[in-house]
UniProtKB/Swiss-Prot annotation:
Protein EC: 5.4.2.10
Active site: S104 (phosphoserine intermediate)
UniProt name for this protein: Phosphoglucosamine mutase
Entry function: Catalyzes the conversion of glucosamine-6-phosphate to glucosamine-1-phosphate.
Keyword entries, A-Z: Isomerase, Magnesium, Metal-binding, Phosphoprotein
Residues the record lists as Phosphoserine modifications: S104
Cofactor dependence: Mg(2+)
Family as reported in the entry's similarity comment: Belongs to the phosphohexose mutase family.
List of residues binding Mg(2+): S104, D243, D245, D247
Amino acid sequence: MISRKYFGTDGVRGEVGKEPMTPQWVMHLAWAVGSVLCDNGFAGEKVLVGKDTRLSGYLFENAIIAGLSAAGMEVHMLGVMPTPGIAYFTRTFNAAAGVVVSASHNVFSDNGVKVFARGGYKLPDSAEQQIEAYLDKPMTLVAPAKMGKVYRVAEARGRYIEFCKNSIPLNLPFHRLKLVLDCAHGATYAVAPDVFRELGAQVIVTNAAPNGCNINDGCGSTHPEALQQRVCQEQADIGIAFDGDGDRVIMVDQRGRIIDGDAILYIIAKYRAFKGEQLNTIVGTLMTNLGLEQSLRKMGITLHRAQVGDRYVLEQLQLLQARVGGENSGHIICLDRNSTGDGIIAALQVLAAILEMETTLEDLIADLALTTQVLKSVTVVERDAVINSAAVQTAIQNAEEKLRNRGRLLLRPSGTEPKIRVMAEGDDETLLNDVVNELIATIKEQEKTHA
């Protein structure tokens, strides 16, 4: 993997007001993106810009427009739009790139920037390295006559709604479904409710009143507890929770149980087989549940594991010429529908499976035996130093010895937050918790040493 200074697994992120998330730095980043596009033969072409509902989005949206215009790129503004919607417009506008202002599932005080290449695919590491090289150069402006113009895309939300609706067969009996949506006060708030209502479902909408500061605040795909309760209270069939920018989805069955990304992948695999579109390969990650791998194998499907991060899932999908992949966190990519993870599209695949196969969400995963996973995170600034410390390395060896032949251990730095994630998987939940808690305690001790 190519070493990058600023880009993580999903673009650039940070706390607003601290580098890199200052207006000056973000403008420089946008100029760098535009400059790389010019170097690669896209001078003066269209670049799409969209954002989620964070208050700081106004600030960074304008900084990006200024930077792109300074590099001579033509800018088309989408306003608030789910990240996969921006990928869709990048593809259908045949734009040189799409730029997203979002920190996805992070707290509102964070923000970030991610970039789609032509075709709506996330940038490869090599392109991000080219952009970072420009960030080390002083910003310059093209000649005044070559500066980029700025336009607003008309009816963008309505166009994306129609795209989502057309991703599944028409005339399915959605009127049979009672849904509860959790829009995380994020970018799906003005899109997802209309998608499901226009298809005919009875829709109860929660967390769809963004004020700029409440995105992901105790809601959405990373906090589904309230959705679980609401589904049971409303006697709904299904709950659907998106994250702040709409590229993740987690679902809830009628009994209030979580249906995570691994279970969603299994349902999509079943649905495609039912329709005669058998999948030979599905791409997961190092975090993908062993139970899913075993269940897919029984269906004649091979699970390939990518590094954690939907960008790496996409790379493997393209390399293997496969169609479906994702992460247990809810990033689900259906490359024959959209070019990136799309929460609405993934949810529609599951609902179409229920309606066409005349079954329930509960029954679709009845034969999926997931193994127990214990996942915990700890905030660490000097992540590499802590992970490579002798104490943590010894603790890892001890943990692996305890789990020998009884499970597996994964410890990794987050690609989107200053955290270290520790995951243990196996059949003995008590053992898994003990192993993870001991490792977390050692990491916290070493964090103090390296602070």
